[in-house]
Amino acid sequence: MILRIPSLLYLFTLLTAVYAVKFDLTSDRNPKPSIIWNFASAHSLVIVTANVPGEPDQQVDIQILDGSERGNVYLSKKDVRGEARLAVTTHESADVGVCLTNRYTGSGNPRVVRSVELDVDIGADAIDYNAIANQESLSILEVEMRKLEAVTKEIVEEMGYLQRREMRMRDTNESTNQRVKVFSVLIICCTIGLGVWQLLHLRSFFKRKYLID
């Protein structure tokens, strides 16, 4: 089957995702973090571009971490002003979070809002294919095929990660169900034992009162 260039570009557009958001970040003396989560495969390049306009008495801090069991913290940057471009490489397949806090350092009303623009490029989206094309003299079709190959690889890795996570959750559910079954059996045994003890106690009581032989 022949795949034409427009069809290839359309398919690539469907597979790629753009993680760009603009939101207001409220300052506080003890600010609560705002976290943007995106999935990233192991050993993936993650580029975070943050545009933070400079405002007096406000300090915006950025931290890049993941939601794995280890809780890896890849980068921390204090007092970000203007445009900041941060790049990290993930250690394992997990959700990667960009954590932002806006700390108020002045003496007046701490509830001040700052508008923040955040762009997160992961894996194939973070690679500069124009530079690769110039370096290796690739045609447009070859560049798009290279992009499509990288995106397909990421999809396969993400599906594998979801499958492994589903297996872990299933094992946890089975283990929990087994413990519940054992606990239920113990409860039933204790209930039966208590009932037998009460019957014996009542029988002994009635004998002492000469109500039964």
From Swiss-Prot:
Record flagged with keyword Protein transport: yes
The membrane-topology field of this record reads:
Single-pass type I membrane protein
Q: Name one GO biological process term.
A: endoplasmic reticulum to Golgi vesicle-mediated transport
Q: Which GO terms describe its cellular component?
A: COPII-coated ER to Golgi transport vesicle; endoplasmic reticulum membrane; Golgi membrane
Intracellular or extracellular location(s): Endoplasmic reticulum membrane; Golgi apparatus membrane
Record's keyword terms, sorted: Endoplasmic reticulum, ER-Golgi transport, Golgi apparatus, Membrane, Protein transport, Signal, Transmembrane, Transmembrane helix, Transport
Q: Which residues form the GOLD domain?
A: 33-122
Q: Which InterPro entries match?
A: Emp24-like, GOLD_dom
Regions crossing the membrane = 182-202
Lumenal-side segments: 21-181
First and last residue of the signal peptide? 1-20
- Mind telling me which SMART domains this protein's record contains? EMP24_GP25L
Q: Which residues face the membrane's Cytoplasmic side?
A: 203-213
Q: What is its main location?
A: endoplasmic reticulum
Positions the record marks as coiled coil are none
Keyword Endoplasmic reticulum assigned to the entry: answer is: yes
Spell out the family assignment given in the record's similarity comment.
Belongs to the EMP24/GP25L family.
Main function: Constituent of COPII-coated endoplasmic reticulum-derived transport vesicles. Required for efficient transport of a subset of secretory proteins to the Golgi. Facilitates retrograde transport from the Golgi to the endoplasmic reticulum.
Protein name (Swiss-Prot/TrEMBL) = Endoplasmic reticulum vesicle protein 25
| Native organism | Cryptococcus neoformans var. neoformans serotype D (strain B-3501A)
GN (gene name): ERV25
